[in-house]
């Protein structure tokens, strides 16, 4: 009997070992770990890891922070649909969380968050404005993202990682799509790139923004909680600044990955 290759094989219930680990202070992981309110976590990225995929990328936010892996397949020809299908390609996104990705019991999706289908649609809406789908008529591009470890701001990390993987696959794009998250602290302070503890301790206000940095255009915006005019404008500004800070890191990673693909010229022995 053929197996389900799309299903994440793992136990129905799982708990991360970090659930039982205490910090040096004897409690949970220590807050911002020295970061300022508007300072994002340092990011490590690498492209071209998976040989089986057309394009791939890995992103890690902070030491022991959120870890995301992405693979891109296609473009592949698909069946005739309608006028839109004939002139424009389609981007399909699958965003899932590994059973061991978070502390606490495994619930089958992101705890207290969207279902895998909803998360995939949110990822798709953030990426579509960056991809030149008109260049791939009657074709589809499949983006598969797995959150290996969720320590906060998983969706923005997935957007950045998927965008890097699309570029690594050679998919024509208008610009990279970069994501950044923000939450409102218990005292009303805006915290850029929050970790999981800060997200849980927040006062009901979170925001996830996707930006095309070169074009300076917002490709996706998701918020929860009540936001007043001035605070929402400040939150959007901080998220855009966070995306702009991330752009040089991904750009440099993409250049290195492209250079690795260029064959080394052999000396002429004649």
UniProtKB/Swiss-Prot annotation:
Alphabetical list of Gene3D superfamilies matching this protein: GHMP Kinase, N-terminal domain
Q: Which domain of life is it from?
A: Eukaryota
Residue ranges, annotated region (Disordered): 23-42
Q: Which GO MF terms are attached to this record?
A: RNA binding
For this record, an example GO cellular component is:
exosome (RNase complex)
User: What keywords sit in the KW lines?
Assistant: Cytoplasm, Exosome, Nucleus, RNA-binding, rRNA processing
Q: Which cysteines are joined by disulfide bonds?
A: none
Q: GO BP, one example?
A: rRNA processing
Where is this gene product found? Cytoplasm; Nucleus, Nucleolus; Nucleus
**Keyword RNA-binding: yes or no?**
yes
Tell me the PANTHER family matching this sequence: EXOSOME COMPLEX COMPONENT, EXOSOME COMPLEX COMPONENT MTR3
* Family that this chain belongs to: Belongs to the RNase PH family.
Biological function: Non-catalytic component of the RNA exosome complex which has 3'->5' exoribonuclease activity and participates in a multitude of cellular RNA processing and degradation events.
How it assembles, according to the record, is: Component of the RNA exosome complex.
Full protein name: Exosome complex component MTR3
What is the species listed in this Swiss-Prot or TrEMBL entry?
Answer: Xenopus tropicalis
């Amino acid at each position: 009997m053929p197996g389900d290759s799309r299903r994440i094989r793992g136990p129905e219930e799982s708990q991360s070992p970090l659930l039982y680990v205490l910090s040096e202070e004897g409690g949970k992981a220590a807050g911002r770990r020295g970061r300022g309110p508007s300072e994002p976590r340092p990011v490590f990225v690498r492209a071209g890891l998976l040989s089986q995929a057309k394009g791939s990328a890995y992103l890690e936010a902070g030491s022991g922070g959120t870890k995301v892996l992405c693979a891109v397949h296609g473009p592949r020809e698909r069946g005739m649909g309608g006028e839109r299908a004939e002139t424009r390609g389609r981007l399909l996104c699958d965003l899932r969380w590994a059973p061991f990705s978070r502390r606490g019991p495994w619930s089958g999706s992101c705890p207290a968050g969207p279902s895998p289908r909803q998360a995939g649609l949110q990822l798709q809406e953030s990426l579509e404005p960056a991809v030149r789908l008109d260049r791939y008529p009657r074709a589809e591009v499949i983006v598969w993202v797995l959150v290996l470890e969720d320590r906060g701001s998983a969706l923005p990390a997935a957007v950045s990682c998927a965008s890097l993987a699309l570029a690594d696959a050679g998919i024509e794009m208008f610009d990279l799509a970069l994501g950044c998250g923000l939450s409102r602290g218990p005292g009303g302070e805006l915290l850029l790139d929050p970790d999981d503890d800060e997200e849980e301790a927040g006062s009901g206000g979170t925001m996830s923004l996707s930006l095309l940095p070169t074009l300076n255009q917002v490709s996706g915006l998701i918020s929860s909680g009540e936001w007043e005019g001035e605070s929402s404008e400040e939150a959007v500004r901080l998220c855009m600044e966070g995306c702009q800070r991330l752009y040089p890191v991904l750009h440099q990673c993409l250049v290195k990955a492209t250079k690795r693909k260029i064959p080394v010229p052999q000396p002429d022995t004649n």
